[in-house]
């Protein structure tokens, strides 16, 4: 008020984050909020969707659904952390490498999962947790037998819509790729964090829930 600015005018400029939508999304958001408010350490993982659920508009008495472009003006609470990116590999095959004595994933389509961290702050607590949003980005290791434009479209589609139409085989494949991308990135990050503090995974079950 000292500067002649109405806080309510500023509030209207910031879009609601397209997070915590849908039944499971709402439940997960409540878990994250409760963990922080009860002062328990905890971290969440999700996909950094370009579009949220949808925006509703009424025209001539009928509902009209519009894309929820919640990041069109940026999201000030997130911090991009490219050095913590992890590769997520689709398709290809797994073979045993005798020379290295381990299994290897070859001929795969690689997509990078880049994290954006958002703080989750509790009410009257000293604990701040993290919600990690994973964004799909193309890999420099592009397969020579793939169409580049199609590859870029496949990468972008992973983080484009929260609930893509899965009534077709292509839609079902996209939903599966979204789930695999999210799980692979999250698990890789957890394992890497563990190995920064401990020499092996022998005590992994004791440190993570």
Language-model regions: role of each:
Residues 1-209:
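A conserved ligand/cofactor-binding region detector
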């Amino acid at each position: 008020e000292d500067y002649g600015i109405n806080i309510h005018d500023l509030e209207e400029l910031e879009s609601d984050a397209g997070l915590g939508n849908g039944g499971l999304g709402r439940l997960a958001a409540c878990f994250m909020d409760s963990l922080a408010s009860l002062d328990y350490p905890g971290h969440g993982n999700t996909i950094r969707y370009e579009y949220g659920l949808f925006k509703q508009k009424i025209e001539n008495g009928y509902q009209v659904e519009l894309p929820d472009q919640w990041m069109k003006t940026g999201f000030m609470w997130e911090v991009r952390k490219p050095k913590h990116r992890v590769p997520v590999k689709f398709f290809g095959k797994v073979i045993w490498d005798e020379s290295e004595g381990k299994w290897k994933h070859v001929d795969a389509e690689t997509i990078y999962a880049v994290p954006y961290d958002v703080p989750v702050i509790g009410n009257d607590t000293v604990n701040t947790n993290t919600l990690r949003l994973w964004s799909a980005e193309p890999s420099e290791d592009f397969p020579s037998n793939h169409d580049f434009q199609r590859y870029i479209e496949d990468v972008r589609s992973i983080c484009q819509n929260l609930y893509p139409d899965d009534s077709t085989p292509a839609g079902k494949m996209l939903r599966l790729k979204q789930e695999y991308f999210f799980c692979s990135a999250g698990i890789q990050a957890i394992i890497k964090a563990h190995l920064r503090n401990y020499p092996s995974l022998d005590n992994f079950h004791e440190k993570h829930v």
